[in-house]
């Protein structure tokens, strides 16, 4: 067992109060801002431009023929264990109640068959991400899904609730937690307190809502453990302060923040609906996980941690709950192809390490009968989980290896991106589809990771 007190690393890790203040201020700006020169506007397509072109119709038709869109297993899994679902889910801003930081009702149009304007595979993913509410993964483990881009997972401890990831904003986290307690209190009377918080990684949609569910004073007074991967504060700081303004502008564009929510505009981001643009917070970890395996007993629940730095996030972990035979995969795996390079801008992710961590998880947590993650819906059955992990492992490894092979032959990033396609054994799986990351973008990322931006052309 390795437990590292954050107090021992105060000066080096945080530069403490100043840096946290800067971080929170920066993230608040990021969360509350919108695209330059278009503040408060929504961009919609109108007139003759609304009709899909012949090329679009043909391309979407080809996708429909390639995939088994009648496969309902994902829908069965996404609805499994539903306890309650809110009606007309809108979460107001804490700063201006007339504005919403989250509006799931805007996506009510996503039903039935895919319209001609939308890729049918993406439409299917959007329908799945529309399934919202409080769900029982297994007795003792619950998830709130569809209240933010990411999930909040609640694990019943001896004295309270262990919270895994606290969403993007204080508003969405508070709303999600209150909704969960409203229904879970019937099963677990007099248990509405937070006994521990775990951040799986250093991206804001997994920690930004923390002070919405518990105050800093309560964290300190009640000595609530805050568990995170080593490097968490440093990476959250570097991403949101140093490059925050540039990332914001690009994130607004990448996520289509100002697009109208309709079949001609915004329907989904693959990973979820969209980020919540609300008030963001952070708190200092008290326990850092820096090696595999690390075993902790958290409020009576046994955790086995896998430390996975420089994978989907610079600082990340996954965990296994042996008493439940449940694998908490964080964002190491998800039900879409992830990105090795995010268009909002970030450090390039190492596909080789990433695929290696998935293989490691597959081996050390091979008894898992349940998988749940920081996004999307769970999976049940050891064989299903093993196949899922193998397929995701092979997807990132294939993109890495084939990009490197072409790179060493002298091909440019653009040439590599156009030349690589996933084999059908991988591409036919819905959880490997290019809803969020793409093969073209990821191939360029592999090149950038090894050789940088220069493509070998003297004119450049």
Q: Where do the PLM segments sit?
A:
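Bacterial N-terminal signal peptides that target proteins for export
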Residues: 6-21
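Metallo-beta-lactamase
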Residues: 136, 227, 233-309, 353-365
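Conserved beta-strand hairpin/beta-sheet module of binuclear metal-dependent hydrolase folds
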Residues: 127-187, 317-320, 325-331
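N-terminal pre-domain segments of enzymes
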Residues: 38-126, 130, 358
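Divalent-metal (often Zn2+) His-rich catalytic cores of metallo-beta-lactamase-fold enzymes
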Residues: 45-64, 295, 326, 336, ...
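Active-site metal-binding motif and surrounding structural segment of the metallo-beta-lactamase
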Residues: 159-160, 171-225
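C-terminal motif of bacterial Sec signal peptides marking the signal peptidase cleavage site
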Residues: 30-31
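Active-site neighborhood of phospho(di)ester-bond hydrolases with catalytic His/Asp-centered motifs
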Residues: 164-166, 193-205, 227-229, 327-330, ...
